[in-house]
Amino acid sequence: MFDLARQTRIILLLGIDVTFFFIEIITGYAIDSLALIADSFHMLNDIVSLLVALWATRLAHSTSHEPKYTYGWQRAEILGALSNGVFLIALCMFIFMEAIERFIEPPSVSNPTLMFFVGSLGLLSNFVGIFLFHDHGHDHPHTHTAQNYDFPEEDDIESVLPSTIVHRCNTSQQEVSHTHTQVADSATESSPLLSYTGNHNGAGTSKPVNNHGSIEQDAPKQTKKRNLNMHGVFLHVLGDALGNIGVISAALFIKYTDYSWRFLFDPCISILLTFIILFSAIPLCKSAALILLQVAPQSIKLDDVSNLINHLDGVESVHELHIWQLSDVKLIATVHVCVTLPDDKGESYTKLTTDIRNVLQSFGIYDVTIQPEFANHPLLCDQGSSS
């Protein structure tokens, strides 16, 4: 059991969730328990999340796509996450309106004993899920490429939904970290301007880059971090367990008390479950929307980046600096830089682009495009600054 692959564990959890979703929703309508119905919708959230996760994972691995999809399917998960969040909020509105109606005219739960047993079975299924994923809620050493930069957890969409975090766990299993090595020759004026660059910390290790200033950092580094992929699934399962505890509490309260208002406990638990769902759905929609709107991550201040680049030797001004997230794990930057260089433009410009990349890499940005504008053509710099 402990050696099960992560994707196998997710499929097992998906099968359990589907089974108990039908058990809870059928029983909930049969005995008129809104708490069971609400908890079944909470479980439906997990089902949709895991289905989107598996679908997006396969899309992310797919190399067959039309040429017009220049970034492939890397944003499929974000789109799925936003759809899932909107769907959850709509479900919460439905449950909330039903709960209000039951406060006005509280129906009697016909079989609290059955409600108790269904809630207990649901709790047992969640203990199985916690058993499958509990070892992924802790820190452990992990090798990754620098392109999979870990920016602060509060900015990471996977901290609120497993549908986007499972992708990283599966791709990390299949990625093979590798280092490209190359003889470090001195650059001359006859050398290609962007034929080499330094590594992340500015050392002299050479590395190939493409011809428009985009760098791919492949050297693996060892870090100690939580596996947020499976940790997110673990938190979701834990949330389901809390929902089942609420259902069990409502069943026991209705069965073993004789208060005239005891049936109000059922819609109270339903509203509590609604807030639990909204607690994950609203941050999910916000995070997904910010990525789709190409907003700069909260962890990066554009003024700080611009000031650091401006202080580099040879930089006259910086404009058109854009930083955004392609997905929850990949940052992209483009920048126009007005530069003043001595006569040996080839070597000086190569060093300057390396310095600019090192600045951006310090913020976790490894996909960089730099457009130079030379100060000996002031019209270009003036036009760029005013655009």
UniProtKB/Swiss-Prot annotation:
Keywords, in A-Z order: Endoplasmic reticulum, Ion transport, Membrane, Nucleus, Transmembrane, Transmembrane helix, Transport, Zinc, Zinc transport
Which residues fall in a compositionally biased region of kind Polar residues? 195-214
Principal location listed in the UniProt entry = endoplasmic reticulum
Q: Which residues are in coiled coils?
A: none
Tell me if Cell membrane is a UniProt keyword of this record: no
List every stretch annotated Disordered: 195-221
Relate the protein's function as given in its record: Involved in zinc homeostasis, where it plays a role in its accumulation in the endoplasmic reticulum/nucleus. Also has a role in the sequestration of cadmium into the endoplasmic reticulum.
| Name of the protein described by the UniProt record | Zinc homeostasis factor 1
**Taxonomic source organism:** Schizosaccharomyces pombe (strain 972 / ATCC 24843) (Fission yeast)
What gene is it encoded by?
zhf1
